[in-house]
Amino acid sequence: MPNYTLYYFNGRGRAEICRMLMAAAGVQYTDKRFEFNEWDKYRNDMPSMCVPVLDIDGQNKMPETMAIARYLARENGYYGKNNMDMFRIDYICDCFYEILHDYMRYFHTKNGRFMQGSGTDMSPDMDPTQMTSYIQNRYLDTCRRILSFLERTLEMRNGGKEFFMGDQMMLCDMMCYCCLENPMLEDQTTFNNFPKLMSLWKRVASHPKITPYLKKRNNTNW
């Protein structure tokens, strides 16, 4: 078994899917967390100067959330049985990641961390309140566009009563939990029209390989 070290800020954010996959698979790893004010110590050691990054045996540093997640899912049996399974899992994951991406920009902008580069159609003269409102609206538009599609996609398999791929939890189901956790905590009403997705979210949380992790993980606000 390789020696893994996962680098990310002290929050769930874009790294939580990687942590959850390793927890579900029983993979041991070092969870290297740091605060925002410590980022300069690590930035230049990261391949693309961003995190999360997964270090493997101190020799390979793998960047990008979904590249790491797919690697871990393939290694541990959470990525389907054939190419068509993987295709379906991929597009479901990519849809959830769109929501996570826009939510994280909104969350950090409203907390004063992102003041630049949040959209190519934004005016550089936009004040912080306008910027936050713009990014929030974009996030909500993404939710409306994607969640209805994912609700229908889930329903295609056994009426949406199990997981996206049937009776076995896969990467895309864990993405549902990780990508919607903070948005649901912030405003549950955004998701009231998607009961099958909300039931899936609860199924993942109650899965015997996930519940112990959720109980013992670090308690952070994002």
Curated annotation (Swiss-Prot):
Q: Which UniProt keywords apply?
A: Eye lens protein
Species classification: Eukaryota, Metazoa, Spiralia, Lophotrochozoa, Mollusca
| GST C-terminal domain sequence ranges | 82-222
Q: Where is the GST N-terminal domain?
A: 2-80
* Protein family membership: Belongs to the GST superfamily.
- Ranges annotated as spanning the membrane: none
Tell me, which GO biological process terms does this entry list? glutathione metabolic process
Name of the protein: S-crystallin SL20-1
> What function is annotated for this protein?
S-crystallins are structural components of squids and octopi eye lens. Contains relatively little if any GST activity.
Q: Which GO terms describe its molecular function?
A: glutathione transferase activity; structural constituent of eye lens
Known InterPro entries for this protein?
Answer: Glutathione-S-Trfase_C-like (IPR010987), Glutathione-S-Trfase_C_sf (IPR036282), Glutathione_S-Trfase (IPR040079), Glutathione_S-Trfase_N (IPR004045), GST_C (IPR004046), GST_superfamily (IPR050213), S-crystallin (IPR003083), Thioredoxin-like_sf (IPR036249)
Tissue specificity here reads: Lens.
What the entry lists under PROSITE patterns is as follows: GST_CTER, GST_NTER
